[in-house]
A protein has these predicted regions:
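Short, electropositive alpha-helical surface patch
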Residues: 104-118, 175-184
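Mid-chain, well-packed structural core segment of small domains
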Residues: 107-142
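Fungal secretory targeting signals
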Residues: 1-27
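Ser/Thr/Gly-rich flexible loops in soluble cytosolic domains mediating phosphotransfer, phosphorylation
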Residues: 136-175
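N-terminal, charge-rich interaction modules
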Residues: 34-66
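Short beta->alpha junction loops
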Residues: 93-102, 154-159
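Short helix-loop-beta junction
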Residues: 81-92
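Glycine- and acidic-residue-enriched helix-capping/strand-helix junction motifs
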Residues: 63-78
Length: 184
């Protein structure tokens, strides 16, 4: 028993000695020339402002919004708050708001010319009990599969949780206060 304990202690000591420490790590050159990032730990990451996301959703003044129990003002404020939080967190975001009565060509044209990191569908479309909006949801998913086949599809669970959905798969390693994202 004493030998087993000695071997275990020796193994732990070797493991601890071989583990890298913060001072052993090679310095990372995150601050390229022309970068808006200041060389202060925690204020910037090379990934800040690099990830592009698009979310399709219902406009806040769509009749289905009122039928859902929310006011247009609540949904508008929520979407604006969510967009601002996404940009502040260091992500680029585009919201494409349209109803089932609008052509999918609108969303298709908004997808062109940008290298999207992921695409999303808002809860107003996914959570609606309307057959027309549910059909539109299926059409949006198919359009995403055809036009952005390699990008992950994200879902929020309320008008203010798109940042949460993004961070589930694309967390930024640092705070992006010195290099925020953009509203595309």
């Amino acid at each position: 028993m004493v030998r087993l304990l000695s071997i275990l202690m020796l193994g732990l000591a070797v493991f601890a000695a071989a583990s890298p420490t913060a001072s052993d790590a090679a310095p990372e050159d995150h601050f390229r020339s022309g970068s808006r990032c200041a060389p202060v730990k925690g204020n910037c990451s090379p990934a800040c402002g690099k990830y592009n996301f698009v979310f399709a959703g219902l406009p806040w003044n769509h009749p289905a919004i009122a039928a859902s129990g929310f006011t247009p003002q609540q949904v508008e404020a929520g979407i604006r708050q969510d967009m601002a939080a996404i940009v502040k967190a260091g992500y680029n975001i585009k919201a494409v708001l349209f109803g089932p009565e609008d052509s999918l060509d609108f969303l298709s044209s908004e997808l062109k010319g940008v290298d999207w990191t992921a695409v999303g569908v808002g809860f107003g479309i996914r959570g609606s009990p309307s057959p027309n909006i549910t059909r539109r949801f299926m059409d949006i998913i198919q359009l995403y599969r055809e036009e952005t086949p390699r990008e992950r599809i994200l879902f929020n669970y309320s008008p203010v949780t798109s940042l949460w959905a993004i961070q589930q798969y694309f967390p930024l390693p640092m705070n992006c206060t010195d290099n925020m994202g953009k509203d595309l």
